[in-house]
Structure formats: structure tokens, C-alpha cells
Amino acid sequence: MLSSTFVRSKAGLVPVILAALILAACTGDAPQTPPPVNIQDEASANSDYYLQQLQQSSDDNKADWQLLAIRALLREAKVPQAAEQLSTLPANLSDTQRQEQQLLAAELLIAQKNTPAAADILAKLEATQLSANQKVRYYQAQIAANQDKATLPLIRAFIAQEPLLTDKAHQDNIDGTWQSLSQLTPQELNTMVINADENVLQGWLDLLRVYQDNKQDPKLLKAGIKDWQTRYPQNPAAKNLPTALTQISNFSQASTAKIALLLPLSGPAQVFADAIQQGFTAAQNGSAVTASVPVTPNVTESSPTDTAAVVSDDTPATLPAPVPPPVVTNAQVKIYDTNTQPLAALLAQAQQDGATLVVGPLLKPEVEQLSATPSTLNILALNQPEASNNSPNICYFALSPEDEARDAAHHLWEQQKRMPLLLVPRGALGERIAKAFADEWQKQGGQTVLQQNFGSTTELKQSINSGAGIRLTGTPVSVSNVAAAPASVTIAGLTIPAPPIDAPVVSTSSSGNIDAVYIIATPSELTLIKPMIDMATSSRSKPALFASSRSYQAGAGPDYRLEMEGIQFSDIPLMAGSNPALLQQASAKYANDYSLVRLYAMGIDAWALANHFSEMRQIPGFQVKGVTGDLTASSDCVITRKLPWLQYRQGMVVPLA
């Protein structure tokens, strides 16, 4: 028999249990309350959900839901709506809410392309007080605010973010760190001051030095990376190498035993093809004089047949580094005329003949066909298509005005010029050059580039006779969509598309902001253009003048050099005086036709590139110091040329220091 005490206790529990069940049933019928809000965590729902919760929540939770809604709106590229919500946040926020508000404000400014203001806000945030999720966003915002420029704060942001990431995001961070480090100049690297406890950063900098010291020798580089991994076992890159360096570990040298040279040896382009072939053959035989010698000739007056750049007696010749000794191998070269068969048939014939590498074709229509012509052969094309495809077996080497214009964009940017005007000949050539310059200009962070076209020499003479100068006005250059539009921004793995850009502002008078003019003209055209610019500008507002190699040709005597006073121009190292013996040899061969001399030089460098095809294709930053420029390859193996720049000064041509 149960005790009366137990019965009474059990009976007393019944009302309590019943009450609990009744309350539970009532709760089930009531509207569900959203879970507690954590603004420091992920915001994975869409903006409509958060805005709905904002409307339905109590005053205590409204600010939290609003902050989450702003983050979702940014993720959905609804930038104006995000800005509106941010501006209506209440003033009485908690410290946690205030931190999230500031982080969102920085992300909004980045989406609006106002990176300086975003950087100011980020500088006031204390990262140690942020959650792990917020830290990822904070460092991503710092990276975006630096506009991917190689700076110490940018590299530190990558390093700080690395432990917070996993999988693909982690590898992307490693690759981003390496890409930023790779953009540092030797001077920046040598003057960089870091803290004693920045062991990870020190390891990265040592890896960069290993790479820079050994990148010209794949075997040494591979050994250097392995040694670095032993010395820095805890560095994140020791466990997961940057993708670019992983490629080096898998480096394999391609065979160049048999080379097929594809050129138009008949037809209207034959004269150009002959010059390239002769340069290629001379380099193959070692008969091209390639030992570089500093040149400081004592010349005060030059004859029309001068073949070397003229430098003053008291000006040191700052010329390109010596080119490497000629690559002399036992390679067999067979030449094919591209005007005799279709490209696909020639490639098949070359492969049947045992070729392991193809150099050519030269003409752009045939180069455009390469991507649609399947071939397992390695191919060094001697021109560049309008849109290059990243084919693992193709590199593109062009000696074109567009290539020179891209180098000019870099040079003007390095000269601190920010508002360039392009003076180009009317027609397709001028349009291509202007587009190439503007594309490269905007990749560096430049804004709108203005373009003005000029007509024939007769038209220029008529203008100058009527007293008309050239005003510093122009129309915006139309560039490709990728280059013209601001880049989208990725924050914490979320891509925010760029907002629409405003219409460009065009300078309409000579008192505008134009600070540089890049001129594509022949010597006779430049003789007329320069005084016309002088007529329309005052000495105080005169911009710096730059020209292409098109303006530097044989026959330019002392009078011409005096008239061109102050103009800077670019040309290949051979023409700039890096190798006077070779220049004299080539100039005599082609009767001072500098156009053919440059193509002869292209043939010499094509031989060097063919023998370093694997390095150019597989090792980022690998460089060949050629007679047409310092040659490196982009990620899709488009060979870029860094050219020397010279200046007309007191009747002489001097290297630009």
C-alpha cells in the first residue's frame, strides 16, 4: 500500500502538469517568434525576410534586423536601398551595433567606389573586438579599399584574414597574397620596415626574394622553394603554395629540336617576313652581334644616317641591361610560306614533318584562326588577336603600335600623369592605338582618356597656315566593357556588382586638366603638330609631350631634334643604343629603313622566345632581355615589352633617367 504522503504529492503534481500542457498548446497556436538576432554572425537570408522582420519586431530588435537587412541588400547589389536603410538607423545604438554599422558603412562606400572614405572608417575599427565572421568582412573590405595595390596594409590584411578561411577561399587568399607581393618593386621591397613579431610576413618576403633571385632558372627556383618550405614550415604558403609557384614545381622543358617557321614569304607582306626570317636565322646561327656595350658617343651633329641614339657627353647612358648571349642550339628550322596553304594544313604538315614548336604565323587573320585550329604543337604566334584565349600551348609576340601604346600608358602613369590626351591619325590605326592605350590606362586605375584625331599632312599644313592651333580637347575613348566598367567588389565571398558609372567629364579648353599628350605621328606630322600645340597653350599650362617610335626614323637631323625639344619617345632597346654594333649591322643591311630594322630585331627575339617557350608559358615573371624590349608574359602568355624612353634635349637624344 502506498503511503498517503506519496499519494498527496503525486496528486499535487497533476494540476502543474496540466497547466504546462495547456500553456504549451496555447503557445503552439500563437505566431512563432523569430530566433534571437545575432548581427555578428552570418546573414544568409534575403533582404525581404530581414525587412519583414524589421516591420514586425519590437523596438529592442529593430536595429538588429535593420543591420542584417543592409548587409543582405549589399549582397544583392541593391546599393541605393542599402544606403537609404543605413541613413535611417537610430542614433542610440549599442557598442556592438555601432561596430556593425561602421563595417557596413565601409562596405557600402566600397560598393560606391569611394575607397578613401572606406579606408578612413576601417582605420577606426578595432579588429580584436569583431567576431570571426566580421573579421573576414573587415579584412576583405581592407583589401578592396586598397584597390589591390601592393601596399603593406594590403598584404597585412591578406595575412590576418588567412586563418579565418577554408577550402577555395583559403587558396584564393594565398594567391592574392602572392599576387600583391609580386607587384612590389625592388626599391619597395628593400625599404619595407616590418615588426619583429611579423614572422608570417617575414616568411612571405623571403619567399619573394627566393623567387626573384632564381626565376630565370627553373631548377634553382624549384630547389629554392623547397629549401624555403623547410625553413618556414608554419607559414601558410609552405603548406599550400601559391598556384603560380605550384606550376613551377611541375615545370617541364619542351623540345625545340625541330622548329617550323610560318611566314608570308610571298605576296605584299613578303618584305616584312623576310626581315623577320633573317633576324631569326642570324640569331640561330649566332651571327647576330648580341653582346651589349654601353654607348656614349661623342657626337654633336648627326648625319642623316646616324644609327645609334645620340647622347650628350655629360649624360650617363642609362640603357637596358645587357641581353643574354645568343641561344645557339642544334635545332633544325624549316620555313613554310603561309600564302601557299590554309593554316590548318600547314600546322598538320609541320607536325607530320616532326616539328615540336611553331613560330608564326605573322598576319593577324591567321593568328585569329589559331584558337579554332586544334593543334598539340607549341606555338609562338608573331601577332596578337583582338581577344586572346588562354591556350596552354600558345604564346603571342607582337611588335605592334598597340603594344607600344600599352607600354606608353604605363610610362605616363609612372610619370605621375593623370589626364592624358591622345593625338592619333584618323582611321582604323588610330582607333586601335587609342583603345589599347585606354584599356591599359584604366587597368592601372586611370579614368577617362581623351582622343583627338588629325588628318593628312596637307590638312595639318592648312591649319597651321591659318593660325589654328591644336586645343587640348577630345572625346572619350570607347574601350571594352571589361575595362570601361568599374570592377565588381567581392566582400567575404559575396560579389557586389559595380554601380553605373557617370558620363565622363571632357576638358573643353586649353586651361583644362590635360597634363600629357601622347602623339602617334610620323616625323613630318610631328614637325607640324608640336608648334600647333604650342600656339594653343601658354607656357604655364603646357602639358608634357610624348611620342611613339613612329616619330623616330632615319634622316632626322639636328634641326629636327632641336624642334622636338622636350618630347619623350619610346623605341626598342636596339634603336635606343643598347647594342651599337648590331644596330650598325642591321641599318646597313636595310639601308637605314628603321621599320625593317625593328622587324629584324623581332626575328632575333623570336628565336630567344622560342628557346624559352616553356619558361614564358609556365613561370610567371620570367623575363627575356631582348633587343625589342624587356619581354615578359601575361597570364595568357601575351608577350609584353617594356621599352626604354628617350628625350630630345638641346639638339640631342638622351636616355631618360
Curated annotation (Swiss-Prot):
SUPFAM superfamilies assigned to the protein according to its UniProt record, in alphabetical order: Periplasmic binding protein-like I
Origin superkingdom: Bacteria
Lipidation (S-diacylglycerol cysteine): 26
CC terms in the record's Gene Ontology section: periplasmic side of cell outer membrane
Covalent lipidation (N-palmitoyl cysteine), chain numbering: 26
GO process terms (BP): peptidoglycan biosynthetic process; regulation of cell shape
Subcellular location: Cell outer membrane
Keyword flag ATP-binding: no
Recorded GO MF terms: enzyme regulator activity
Keyword Signal on entry: yes
Keyword annotations: Cell outer membrane, Cell shape, Lipoprotein, Membrane, Palmitate, Peptidoglycan synthesis, Signal
Primary location recorded for the protein, binned into one broad class: membrane
Annotated family: Belongs to the LpoA family.
Quaternary structure and interacting proteins, as annotated: Interacts with PBP1a.
Name recorded for this polypeptide: Penicillin-binding protein activator LpoA
Protein source organism: Yersinia pestis bv. Antiqua (strain Angola)
